[in-house]
């Protein structure tokens, strides 16, 4: 499947959730014991590891309701809603999540070092290369959204990076 060219439509909203809803999401994230059954590898060359755990229904419902209301969109399907813990890596793991089932996604930063180096980088393609164009720092309860064909990566390669927990969601919109 050919990935369509991407224009950036990245939106950032600090204090996205109410204190009550963020506490629920944060409490669930803090109780997760990420282990070897939760590993996700990006590719065979680098084997950068993401630890993931599916979010419970209460968290899915909070995310769907708030994203739908904030962006004034109708969500047909929530394809992915999972906690992700990213560890430090030596290389950038640039990727996009485009598929027929996913056209919009969000990351809600939950727990980590609140600085730019624990956030997410957004890239443009120049030939066979991806060039960092925009980076967004980590801040708890910050929601970042973009279309699924945008190239992105955690900024986990910098010296200042510390492990972070985020809530990743991917949607099919009406």
Model feature map: region roles:
Residues 1-82, 89-91:
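Non-heme Fe(II)/2-oxoglutarate
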Residues 80, 84-174:
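Catalytic core of non-heme Fe(II) oxygenases with the double-stranded beta-helix
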């Amino acid at each position: 499947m050919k990935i369509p060219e991407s224009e950036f439509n990245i939106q950032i909203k600090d204090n996205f959730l109410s204190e009550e809803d963020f506490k629920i999401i944060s409490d669930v994230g803090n109780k997760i014991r990420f282990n070897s059954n939760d590993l996700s590898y990006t590719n065979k060359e680098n084997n950068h590891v993401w630890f993931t755990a599916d979010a419970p229904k209460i968290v899915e419902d909070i995310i769907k309701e708030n994203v739908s209301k904030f962006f004034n969109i109708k969500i047909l399907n929530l394809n992915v809603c999972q906690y992700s813990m990213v560890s430090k890596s030596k290389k950038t793991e640039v990727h996009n999540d485009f598929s027929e089932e996913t056209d919009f996604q969000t990351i809600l930063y939950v727990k980590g070092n609140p600085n730019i180096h624990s956030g997410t980088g957004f890239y443009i393609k120049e030939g066979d290369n991806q060039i960092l164009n925009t980076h967004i720092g980590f801040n708890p309860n910050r929601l970042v959204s973009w279309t699924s064909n945008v190239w992105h990566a955690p900024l986990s390669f910098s010296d200042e990076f510390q492990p972070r927990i985020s809530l990743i969601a991917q949607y099919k919109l009406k």
